[in-house]
Amino acid sequence: PALVRTSPRECDLILVGEDNLVDCADWLGNCAGIVLDLADMPPLNDAEIEAILVSITCKMNDESMILLRDRVDRVDHLFRLVVDLDLDGAVIDAAAPGDSRAASALPRIGLAARAMNLTEQGRHLLIEIDEAPSAEDMLIAVAAGCPILVAPPPEDGLEETLVWLDSAVRGWMHELGLDGLEKLSRRNLRALDYDTASISGLRLIGYDRPLPMWLGN
């Protein structure tokens, strides 16, 4: 499956922004769902967002998915909208201001998702990064409660990259002493620097507990 702006396949999601809000109507009946990109829209209140979604979904199949997309620095607002509007999930752009890596953004996303009980409600979390993921990125995403990554295709062959990722993930799982991805959690993650530990609440490497400001949470 792919996230596209035009000409979707039946398994693809359409990314809907200000530029293709009208033209997307031509493909709504031939896709797996839509992702309304709030980062690519003018400021909207809840009622305006709901009105746009109603106008779009009336032309879609009943089983099609409806998701919202926004920046990682607005993740709490994004998750609230998903719950209040009873949508299928969210796409979070992990390329935060300052060009931070997904590794530091994902724990924050996981904390917000847990606070809203999104996983227990059966809603989907998709994390978007701006480069092909490494095995470490994939494991961090799963541990943070976000099992789906959206990323550009690798520069090398896709099949070769998937084989390499499978091998690398298995190696990491063996090193962690885990036999299934479902057993991976935040407890397996470590922050490599103080800033990441203070923002995310992860244990700082070499310090076997969260920083003092997180011990009460």
Predicted regions and their residues:
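N-terminal capping/small domains of soluble enzymes
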Residues: 1-36, 168, 172, 179-217
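Alpha/beta enzyme core
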Residues: 3-130, 134-155, 204-206
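Hydrophobic alpha-helical packing residues
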Residues: 56, 109, 165-172
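Short acidic (Asp/Glu) and glycine-rich catalytic loops that position anionic groups and cofactors
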Residues: 88-92, 165-166, 177
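Generic recognition of stable, solvent-exposed alpha-helical segments in well-folded globular domains
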Residues: 104, 136, 160-168, 179
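A short, terminal or domain-edge coil/loop segment
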Residues: 113, 139-142, 147, 170, ...
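Short beta-alpha connecting loops at secondary-structure transitions
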Residues: 153-159, 172
